[in-house]
Amino acid sequence: VNASRTIGNRSRLALACLATAFAVAASVAPATASAGSDTTWICKPGQADDLCAGTIKGETFPPPGEQAEPLGYTRPKDPPVDCFYLYPTQSEQEGPNSNLDKDPPIRRVVVQQARMFSSVCDVYAPMYRQVTNNGDQTKLNHSVEVAYRSARSGFRDYLRNYNDGRGFILLGHSQGSAHVARLIEEIVDKRPGLRKRFVGAIAPGANISVPIGKDVGGLFDHVPACSEVGQYGCVIAYSTFDAVPGPTAPFSRLDFGYWIYPDPRPDPASFEVICTNPALLDGGDGTLEPLVNFDYLFGVPAGGETESPWRGEPDFYRVECKRQDGAHWLNLSKVGLPGDSRPDLGAAVASGSNYHVPEVNLAEGNLLRIAQLQSDSYEADQAAIAAKLKSLKAKLGDGKQRLAERRKTIDRLTRKLRKAEGQKQRKALKRRVKANRKKAAVTRESIRSLRERISELEQRLA
């Protein structure tokens, strides 16, 4: 099965159905790639056509008996971390790899998946030469390598020219997640200095592997799957189904389906696909918080966006990670509140039991909270490390001053000792020299210990 073509076609049909179901008028507006730099950015802070700078206002589809409420997302004036996003397979261009034009399908998915993260971070999203819906993603091939190298070029540009030592979160979905995973494996995981700034990754739908029952040791040597609320430096990844994935499911299993990494396909007897539950790792109770932009359901709105196009649907879906028959997946079910007649947003765009297409937006609210918790934990740790470093460096300065004074005292006493004539005076001076040398040795050991602690903390400080 050509996963790229199949997923892309299902996505287009499903979105058309969903748009019709809610009677949302939309049409396609042309867009061209900007020029003048090595990277074409579809989202970049301060850029005139930054697609992630649009409205994030909206309200809920409330549960039965409750009133609609504003979603309440706002943008921080100076977010402490960045997000780097790679979009999923969307290009409908004829060749195996897309050019860098900002085509409507790409603009639509960038708004749907990435824009809301601007409530947590500065979002950078490069255009890249992704494998198109007409390309082949069944295995690693030339087209996949072209796409990855293009995405990698954007990431290197971001690190070199925009990161400025800040913490960063990697975001992706499907093909975008697979390229994010390779960026982690080949760049982040291998560079301790970069791992210090790695706040986390959100990369659903890409079959990232770990040893069965473990958090680390598969595709990545150092970066683990997230397992605790507020944990940073880890990966959120999952594949969503509402039933046991079949033996030929493209996601959730390693013996079949999506695998476009240079590494050999792992042995499913020893390894499994990561499943991290976003509805628990956000500190919640297992219920999803979907977020959907209704202006961009079908395409790019011809008349521009409305003021408040986002809709949430709390307490409609519940999820849990499950293992069965070689699959490891995020199992979706309905909460089933009495009298709940709200639209089943996920089923409208799913492919049977496979919820790959909507799995980011179905958990968008949870993912935003996870990103915020990771950012908060990272910043708190960095602030604590910086404060501790300041304290230790002050102690080091005091220690050096004490040692210098002690040495002066020893030199002065030694000179006196050389000139002393009486035995009693010489013995007293010797005792004082010996005592000061002991104190100097203690101070030197304290300085050595302080330097070691400072070095350890500096290695943890971004």
What is each residue range found by the language model?
Residues 34-71:
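N-terminal module-boundary/linker segments of secreted carbohydrate-active enzymes
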Residues 385-462:
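Extended amphipathic alpha-helical heptad-repeat regions
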Residues 25-37:
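C-terminal region of N-terminal signal peptides and the immediate post-cleavage residues
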Residues 150-164, 185-347, 354-359, 364, ...:
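Surface cap/lid and interfacial helix-loop subdomains adjacent to catalytic sites
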Residues 2-18:
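Bacterial N-terminal signal peptides that target proteins for export
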Residues 39, 45-48, 76-79, 85-167, ...:
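Active-site catalytic motif of lipid deacylating hydrolases and related acyltransferases
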Residues 172-176, 180:
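Gly/Ala-rich beta-loop-alpha elbow adjacent to hydrolase catalytic centers
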Residues 16-27:
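Bacterial N-terminal signal peptides
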